[in-house]
Amino acid sequence: MVRKLVQSFLFIALFFVSCNTRQKQKAKPSFLSAKEVVRLNQVVYKSTIAESLSQYSPEFEAVFIPEAINGNFAFIAKKKETEQYALVIRGSVIEFSNEGFQNFVMQDFNIFTIKSWPYTDTIQQAYVSNGAWIGFQNLLQLRDKSSGLTIKEFIEQKIPVEASFVITGHSLGGNLAYPMAGYLKNELPAEKGGNLQLITFGAPAVGNAAFVKDMEEKFPSAERYTTDKDIATVFPDMDKVREIAHITGLDSVLQLSKLSIPGINKLKTSDLLDIAGEILKATKVINETNRYVQSQRHLRLLTVDAAAVPADTSYTAESLFNRAYQFHKVDRYADLLGVNPLE
């Protein structure tokens, strides 16, 4: 009798241990943190991803590396010891020279035409900028050099169901992370679409209020990091651009009467921004339906000390964009999250 009781006890104990082990094995890992993925957003601008991860983030490995298409590039990183993944979308390469920042605002960020966004659940009349649509289409074409798979195919075929997956990007990479995340959430099987998270840094607005509402429903806990002095994140809202220009001192730097711009004399900063705003309205980019907005639910606001970026009193166009760049660069966001700049 005693022997049978002991055997029964051992059987029950082993059963509970086995169940507990299976539960642990099936437990979904947490999402990578903003601090972890901002480091990956620094790495994505390096020319050699695998080597840069080994040097700067040895706890990660690159499992998906494609060739860039029309300047758009992204890679998938995996934390070696866990099933935690991130799709890291590169921003505009040209912004990483101070002189190139103006190209990012005036040329790369193609906002003057809009595109209907089809990957919503119940939301109607969602639109994104034409620039975001073009970049998103390029991302869909990326194929891993090793497996030949697209991003969606790689997630479906190579990433375990229980894995966590963050879509992230800085600047235009963050801009493109929004449509890419919305697309994956909509198109992946439910068991994988439920394991997605969205984290961006310094991302300009992507689309209208309907697009943002759909993204907030899909990703209620997404994190959109911006600083209080980053003009890129409020463009093309000219009222907010004017406000940040004043806070950062850009309005004092942008003294157009002192700039070497043919045909422009004694034009105030506020006049320039008013003209830009009128252009956006005249082209019907801004109206009640299609006004570009950012998610306030996703917002994670970081504060920058303006004194950390001394003003340049040379009053040149270069000095204006250089100062804006200093508040927008990925290393600024990394620093605010406690991550060192890369060499």
Per-range role (PLM):
Residues 1-28:
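Bacterial Sec-dependent N-terminal signal peptides
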Residues 20-82, 90-92:
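N-terminal low-complexity, Ser/Thr- and acidic-residue-enriched intrinsically disordered segments
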Residues 53-57, 102-105, 242:
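Short, polar loop/linker segments at the starts of domains and inter-domain junctions
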Residues 61-168, 188-191, 195, 218-219:
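A conserved cap/lid and substrate-binding interface adjacent to the catalytic center
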Residues 94, 148, 152, 184-186, ...:
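Short regulatory "switch" loops immediately downstream of catalytic or recognition motifs
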Residues 152-235:
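Serine-dependent carboxylesterase/thioesterase catalytic core
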Residues 212-343:
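Lipolytic serine-hydrolase domain surface
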